[in-house]
Every structure is written in C-alpha cells, then in structure tokens.
Design a protein with these regions (language model features):
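Generic detector of intrinsically disordered, low-complexity, polar/charged segments
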Residues: 5-6, 52, 62, 137, ...
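Glycine-centered flexibility motif
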Residues: 8, 55, 60, 186, ...
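Extracellular structured ligand-interaction cores
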Residues: 9, 57-64, 163-171
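Residue-identity detector for threonine
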Residues: 14-19, 28, 32, 50-51, ...
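An aromatic- and glycine-enriched ligand-binding surface/loop that stacks and positions planar moieties
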Residues: 41, 71-198
C-alpha cells in the first residue's frame, strides 16, 4: 500500500530470480494495489487470530491492511471516473471483521507496567498540591497517568501485554545496543508515510 501511495506504481516482482534482471516495468498504482490485495486475500485464512509471540502477523493485521487498500482503490477509481462503491463496501466489510471479532477493543482501564505509579512520578510534585478533583493545582491537568498514557509505555504496546487495541505492532528492543559494548549506539530507524494527494 505505501509503495503505491509513495511512488504511484512499482515494478511487481512475482517470481524469485537468481540472476540480475534489468528490464523491470513499472506497474500502475491500481495494479500495485490489486497485487497486494490478491496476495493478502490468498493468505488471510491461513493466519492465526492471535499469537503468543509479539510481532507475528495475525489475521486482523491483514484485514486492516485490506481495508486500507480497498479505500485507496476506491479513491483511485473515483478519481478516474469509475465506480468505487464495491471497493468501499469491501473496505467496510474488512473493518467490520476486525471490529466484530471480539478480539480487539478500546482500552478503558489503566493497565500494565506503570499503572500503579504515584503522582510524584508524573509531575515531580507532592500529592499535597493536588486539588480535590485530582488535578495538578497550577494547570488543571490530571495528575496521574491514564489509560492513553499506558498504551505507549515500554512493556505495554503489544496485544500479548494486555493491550487489546494493539493489532500488529512494530517491535522495539531498547537493550540491543548493549550487545556491542560501548562502541554501539542506538539506531533510530527512519519513519516514512504515504504522500498526501490533492
């Protein structure tokens, strides 16, 4: 999906090659989307609903991506004067599959590694400065963490950690740099997103 959004269309490599090849042809954005759709729809039923190991591909991740791909396909069809209704209906169907599965839901209560930390941790202030409605007296902000805060704490990001909003999370290892001693440094990967269309 992101390749289609970033570059419009890319060469589609559908077979493994062991020799150099220089005559790849660029596909259209629609062909790029359709290839991704076809590949994902072919594997969706082979994927587990959940896994014990964080970072592994699950069915809802594919359903989510198919939803996005069908929206993108619909936008492209509309821009080209085509009928986008079936693409949008497929997007709705895949989104409903995730929502209605009962596996994922919005978090409504504090959870995880830092749910019991006191207010001193959050604002480096004493509990004496709290108001009766448990806000920080000078700014009126909640003095304690909340469920939204918990979603992003180390050890809370994954479904396996109790985060029922997490479908498929990028895995971060904050300790890996230590394996090379003092010569290593943290490697922050680049983050990219799709282009915005006009």
């Amino acid at each position: 999906r992101n390749l289609g959004e970033l570059f419009g269309g890319v060469p589609l490599v559908t077979e493994i090659t062991s020799t150099p090849k220089y005559d790849y042809k660029r596909s259209t954005r629609m062909e790029t989307y359709q290839y991704a759709i076809d590949e994902m729809e072919n594997i969706i039923n082979d994927l587990p609903v959940t896994t014990a190991e964080a970072g592994r591909l699950v069915r809802a991740a594919v359903q989510h991506n198919l939803c996005q791909l069908y929206i993108d396909k619909g936008v492209l069809l509309e821009a080209e004067g085509g009928d986008a209704a079936s693409a949008y209906n497929k997007a709705i169907s895949y989104a409903n599959d995730v929502i209605d599965s009962g596996t994922y839901s919005l978090m409504t209560e504090r959870f995880g590694a830092r749910k019991n930390e006191g207010p001193e941790f959050y604002y480096a202030t004493s509990a004496v400065e709290q108001t009766a409605d448990r806000t920080y007296s000078s700014a009126g902000y909640p003095i304690e963490g909340n469920v939204y805060w918990d979603l992003f704490q180390v050890g809370n990001q994954d479904y396996q950690d109790g985060n029922t909003e997490a479908i498929w999370c990028a895995q971060s290892d904050y300790e890996v740099y230590k394996s090379d001693g003092s010569l290593a440094c943290l490697d922050y990967p680049a983050i990219y997103g799709p282009v915005f269309r006009d």
